[in-house]
Regions:
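Short, glycine-/Ser/Thr-/acidic-enriched flexible segments
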Residues: 6-8, 15, 24-28, 38-41, ...
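FAD cofactor-binding and catalytic pocket of flavoenzymes
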Residues: 68-203, 208-214, 254-258, 279, ...
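Fe(II)/2-oxoglutarate
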Residues: 165, 321-324
Length: 324
């Protein structure tokens, strides 16, 4: 294992087969090569695409694995939008020596028929509680909740302590995390003018939400409203309208980015085959989120692990057969 290293590119021979990687040692800031019969990339969807695009040669003039022109394209991340509320019925609860539901959440899966809705696919709901450490200050102290009861905001000493006890655990939050539609016009590419501190060209990301995602976020908040109304709750934050994309987080904020080296049977329309093996270089494999053609609304990590396992089995099988 080589630590504190930054991979620049995959090196290929005259036949276009990968035989090494080039990397920068961050400690002495020198460039080295590490040879290998099989190259496995697992740098994450965007960074793996960056390595491939930087791996240009006379045979792979558009970057390694990019004869299709698809490397970097179809980048997509989960959608995300949230809303918070104050629940009067949760006031004055008995306080236990417990962690309760604070930063973690309760997961509610998608259960609706989207053929009856105005957007494709779906989303799940995450409900999280207010049993974290009480805070104090302008805009976020527990005594600010007095305004929802028509009472005076402010206080210190005994009145502040009483407010903390009364309001502790009486706020909740709901987040939606949904499936984004993979589109060719959402992509990352090499920036022709910018390099990092190691002299390696960086990525430039081009990404926008479509009406599919905006309508999904709109439905999220309509659902949140129904839940809060049924609880007798009062929304305290996070109820934007369409001019703010219904509170959609910026692309990349949910950190489920996938899709930049999509798998497929057709080398003209995909980067890898179903075993995450490059169409253009049979001894190069990708085992991160890049090969995803789409992803559902939950974290992709376990699927990445499962596909990596399958790819490992495939590599062993191909080595035994001397195919690679």
């Amino acid at each position: 294992m080589y630590l504190n290293c930054m991979v620049r590119e995959v090196i290929t021979n005259q036949e276009g087969k990968a035989n090494a990687i080039s990397y920068i040692n961050k400690e002495d800031r020198k460039e080295y090569q590490l040879k290998g019969n099989i190259i496995i990339l697992a740098a994450s969807a965007c960074s793996t695409a960056r390595i491939l695009l930087n791996s240009k040669s006379s045979i792979h003039d558009a970057g390694l694995g990019n004869s299709s022109g698809v490397v970097g394209k179809y980048l997509h991340d989960s959608t995300g939008s949230s809303q918070g509320a104050f629940v009067p019925d949760l006031m004055n609860r008995k306080i236990y020596n417990e962690d309760g539901v604070g930063g973690m959440h309760v997961y509610t899966p998608w259960w609706l028929d989207n053929s009856k809705l105005d957007f494709p696919r779906g989303y799940h709901i995450e409900v999280w509680g207010g049993l974290g450490m009480p805070s104090y200050g302008f805009g976020f102290g527990p005594n600010n909740l007095n305004k929802y009861l028509g009472e005076e905001i402010g206080g210190y000493g005994d009145s502040l302590r009483d407010d903390v006890k009364r309001f502790y655990g009486s706020v909740i939050g709901i987040s939606g995390r949904g499936e984004c539609i993979a589109r060719e016009d959402n992509y990352c590419e090499l920036d022709p003018d910018v390099v990092d501190e190691w002299g390696i060209p960086v990525l430039r990301v081009n990404y926008t939400w479509s009406d599919h995602e905006r309508l999904q976020a709109k439905h999220m908040h309509e659902t949140f409203d129904e839940i809060f109304d049924a609880m007798g709750a009062k929304t305290t934050w996070g109820r934007p309208e369409g001019d703010a994309d219904y509170g959609l987080q910026a692309p990349g904020r949910i950190i489920h980015e996938v899709g930049t080296t999509r798998m497929g049977n057709d080398p003209k329309r995909s980067v890898t085959n179903k075993f995450q093996q490059l169409h253009d270089a049979k001894n190069v494999f990708i085992v991160d989120g890049g090969p995803f053609v789409s992803q559902a609304d939950k974290n992709p990590t376990w699927t990445i692990m499962a596909l990596s396992w399958r790819t490992s089995d495939f590599i062993i099988d191909q080595l035994k057969k001397q195919n690679i």
